[in-house]
């Protein structure tokens, strides 16, 4: 098997926007993976949450990592609630239900790293 190693750069100004299902008052950009780069294991998005912006309670078959870059984001699961400040991070297991909300009056930005769904999901 041959692997071709090639760096892939996505410039912020050229990152495509995408609609994240179940999100309101959230603008999302795809930075890596999916249609942007050949990443085989995960994709990376950047989500800008306006005040009271939210991702409704949902789960998926892929694990997720959230890293807050600016502002504050509250992540709620069935077993815990945590408010994340800049450079705080959070792991959400595959199948774990979560709600994400910006409860502040200032915008918040979060990096989203998500594994691809297992084949057949």
Predicted regions and their residues:
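A short, N-terminal "cap"/entry segment at the start of jelly-roll beta-barrel domains
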Residues: 1-41, 121
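Short beta-strand His + acidic residue motifs that chelate non-heme Fe in jelly-roll/DSBH
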Residues: 55-57, 75-76, 92, 98-105
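A short hydrophobic beta-strand segment most commonly corresponding to one strand
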Residues: 47, 91, 106-121
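Short, conserved beta-strand element in jelly-roll/cupin
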Residues: 46-50, 60-75
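Residue-level recognition of conserved beta-strand positions in structured domain cores
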Residues: 59, 70, 77-79, 102, ...
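Short acidic-glycine-tyrosine-enriched beta hairpin
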Residues: 79-94
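Conserved short histidine dyad/triad with adjacent acidic residue
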Residues: 30-33, 43-60, 94
């Amino acid at each position: 098997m041959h692997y071709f190693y090639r760096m892939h750069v996505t410039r912020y100004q050229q990152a495509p926007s995408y609609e994240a299902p179940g999100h309101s008052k959230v603008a999302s950009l795809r930075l890596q993976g999916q249609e942007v780069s050949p990443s085989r294991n995960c994709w990376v998005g950047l989500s800008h949450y306006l005040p009271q912006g939210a991702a409704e309670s949902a789960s998926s078959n892929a694990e997720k990592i959230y890293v807050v870059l600016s502002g504050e984001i509250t992540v709620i699961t069935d077993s815990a609630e945590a408010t994340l400040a800049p450079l705080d991070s959070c792991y959400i297991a595959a199948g774990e239900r979560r709600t994400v909300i910006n409860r502040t009056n200032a915008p918040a930005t979060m990096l989203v790293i998500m594994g691809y769904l297992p084949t057949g999901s």
